[in-house]
Structure formats: C-alpha cells, structure tokens
A protein has these predicted regions:
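Alpha-helical transmembrane segments of multi-pass membrane proteins
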Residues: 18-32, 57-74, 99-104, 108, ...
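Long, contiguous bundles of hydrophobic transmembrane helices that form the permeation core
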Residues: 101-214, 372
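Alpha-helical transmembrane segments in multi-pass membrane proteins
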Residues: 20, 24-28, 106, 110, ...
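Selective recognition of specific alpha-helical transmembrane segments in multi-pass small-molecule
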Residues: 158-169, 220-235, 361-362
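Inter-helical loop and helix-membrane interface segments of multi-pass membrane transporters/permeases
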Residues: 84-98, 131-145, 169-178, 245-259
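Membrane-embedded alpha-helical segments and adjacent helix-loop junctions characteristic
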Residues: 1-55, 202-302
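Juxtamembrane and boundary regions of transmembrane helices in multi-pass small-molecule transporters
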Residues: 88, 92-147, 320-372
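Alpha-helical transmembrane segments
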Residues: 54-64, 198-208, 308-312, 329-351
C-alpha cells in the first residue's frame, strides 16, 4: 500500500496521459541538470513511474519522456554541471561559458523541437491498452498490501526521505555519473529490503531473493541482444586497438569522421552540416562524450577557416554526439531508462528516431541563422 499512499497527492495533478508526460519529462530535465541523467533515471523513475502508470501513461511513452528530456535535452545542454561543454570548449580553445552563452538558442531549439515533436507524433498512443498489464500489477499489489497500514505508512515516508537524502549527499560530495547512480541504486536495494521486512517478516529473505532473481532475469531477457549488436559497433571504436594493434588507433567510426572533416568545403553552412554529421557518427559508440574532443577541435578549425562562430559549431557537434550516443538513438545507451520502465531499448530507440531527426534539422537551421 505504500505506492498507493505515494500516488495520492500526485494523482490530483496527473489526470491525463498528456499532462503526465510533460510533468514527467520536465521533472526529469530539472533533476538531470543537477545530477546528470543516469542517477536521475533511478531517482525519478522509482517515484514517478507508478504515478504515470496510474494516470494511464504507457510505459513506452514514459520512457520517451524521461529519455528525451534527460539523456537528450539536459545532457547535451549541461548548463549546471558543464561536463560536456567543458570537454568541447577545451578542444575548441574557448571557454565553456562561451558555448553556453553564445549557442544557447541552438540547445533550446534542439531540445524544445525534439520533445514537442515526440509529444505530437505519439499523443494518440500515450494511453494505449499496453498499459493494462502494468496497471493490473499495481492494483493487485495495492489490494494485497492494504492490510499492512503501518508498514505502508513507514515505507511511504521512508522512500521520498531516502531519495531526498541521496540528492543532498550527491550535491554535498559532488557525486555524479556512475558514483551517483551507485548511491541511488544502493538506496533502492536497502528500501526493498526494508519494505520486505516490514511487509513479510520472517519471509522477507525469500521475497528479497525472488525480487533480485526477477530483476536479473528481466535484464538478461531484454538486454542480451543489445550486447551482441553493440559488439559490432565497439569494434569500430577505439577498443579495436586491443585486437588489431595500435595501427588502428582511431577506430573505423572515427576514421569516417576524420575523412569527412578532410573533405569538407570551407563554407560556414557546409561546415555546420558536417559538424552535426560528425557528432552523430562519433556518438554511435554509445558514449556521447568520446566524440566531443574531435567535434571541438573541428569547430576551432572550421570556425577559424570560415570566420564562423566557434561556439555555435562546437554546440552542433556536441548536440549530435550526445543525442545519438548519450543517448536517445543508440539502443545500448538507453538501458537505464528502458530497464526502469520495463520496455525494450530497441523499441524505445525506434520511437525516439523521428523526433530526434526533426530536432537535429531544426537545430541545424537555427545554427545557420546564427552564422549569417
């Protein structure tokens, strides 16, 4: 019954799938700016996904909202932590403040157009019948645990307090990325054990074991194909040096980017186009950040040669690399969001592709207008 108690206040706001989608996305965006998307997925998902399910939002639509607002918009902009702008700026010979202050319209056009396109393209399927199975699970859990009022109240109070303590801890100790994810994940495991003890008493070890088994089985069943597909792309990245030697240090994917850079005409608009393409190519390794030194260096080269804005060119490359690999397009970059929403990462990537392409087109047009 703890999830039912937690849902009560939010149910007054989350009345329709459309409103729920925007509220979930904006919440994910704000958390991702301060904590980065990976820990925010676990933090926001653990609290808000049950609310979204109860409001009628499909798991796939919820995953899209969290992924596009978090791993796309917030991570590519990164105005608070400034990890991505710092890498791009260092390679481009400018400051991170230059990118954020001069190219902010490009970031907002990319993020705004992408999430709006995603909403408009999927608004009719946000509350489909696919949700019924998840909704039934929640309802059964509610009805079976309503008798444990004390346990439900204790757990309902412990969950938000524990995750709030995580936020304070991450901000105080400057934890982000994998470290922050570990803090949130560890808290979730402790809460699961605490809830099992309160709800099932002596049977709690068996329940915890079953929950862990179900989680591992789900991960293996859903993400095993991702490992195989990802292996072929990783062979094209820098990791190929461990197999074929140092002579292949750049990797096949980076070779494509370098070749395109060498054959790009000296025109600000063509340079902007290839900056975007090269950023997307470097993002295919599933990292997003690995291509930022290359796109930053090319922004400096192209900007100097064509008298174009280096921050705008660097922002374009950064947007392409992170939206593709950070990620919203590459399936193995979607694993955290797909896992928390119980959806296929490949299906999520397929749904993300049209709005991201629309957003990239809009960002390119905005950049060209700024280069005039």
């Amino acid at each position: 019954g703890s999830d039912r108690l937690l849902m009560e206040p939010m149910s007054k706001v989350m009345k329709t799938p459309a409103r729920t989608w925007w509220l979930l996305g904006v919440t994910m965006f704000l958390f991702s700016l301060f904590l980065w998307p990976s820990p925010s997925v676990a933090l926001v998902g653990a609290i808000m996904i049950p609310f979204a399910v109860r409001a009628g939002l499909s798991p796939l639509a919820a995953a899209m909202a969290m992924n596009l607002f978090g791993h796309g918009f917030a991570l590519s902009y990164d105005v608070v932590i400034q990890g991505a702008p710092a890498i791009s700026a260092a390679a481009a010979g400018i400051s991170a403040a230059d990118i954020l202050s001069q190219a902010w319209p490009v970031f907002w056009v990319m993020g705004g157009v992408t999430v709006l396109a995603a909403f408009l393209l999927n608004r009719k399927s946000m509350g489909t019948a696919k949700l019924s199975s998840s909704g039934n699970v929640v309802n059964k859990q509610d009805s079976g645990s309503q008798g444990n009022s004390r346990a439900a109240l204790a757990l309902a109070a412990a969950v938000p307090l524990a995750f709030l303590a995580d936020i304070v801890c991450m901000l105080a100790l400057d934890l982000n990325g994998g470290d922050a994810t570990s803090v949130v994940s560890g808290t979730a495991v402790l809460l699961m054990c605490f809830g099992a003890v309160l709800g099932f008493g002596k049977q709690s070890p068996e329940k915890v074991t079953r929950y862990l088994t179900d989680g591992f089985l789900f991960a293996i069943r859903i993400f095993a194909p991702v490992i195989v597909i990802g292996a072929f792309f990783f062979l094209g990245g820098g990791g190929i040096t461990s197999i074929l030697g140092e002579g292949f240090g750049d990797g096949i994917l980076n070779d494509w980017a370098v070749w395109l850079a060498a054959h790009t005409p000296l025109n600000p608009y063509i340079a902007a186009f290839f900056q975007l393409i090269i950023g997307c190519l470097t993002g295919l390794d599933g990292s997003g950040f690995s291509g930022l030194p290359l796109t930053g260096a090319l922004a400096h080269t192209f900007g100097t040669a064509t008298f174009a804005s280096v921050p705008v060119l660097a922002a374009l490359g950064q947007i392409g690399a992170i939206f593709v690999g950070g990620g919203t397009i590459v399936p193995w970059g979607l694993i955290p969001v797909a896992a928390i929403c119980n959806v296929s990462p490949i299906e999520l990537a397929r749904k993300n592709l049209p709005p991201v392409l629309i957003g990239l087109t809009a960002a390119f047009i905005a950049a060209c207008l700024m280069l005039v």
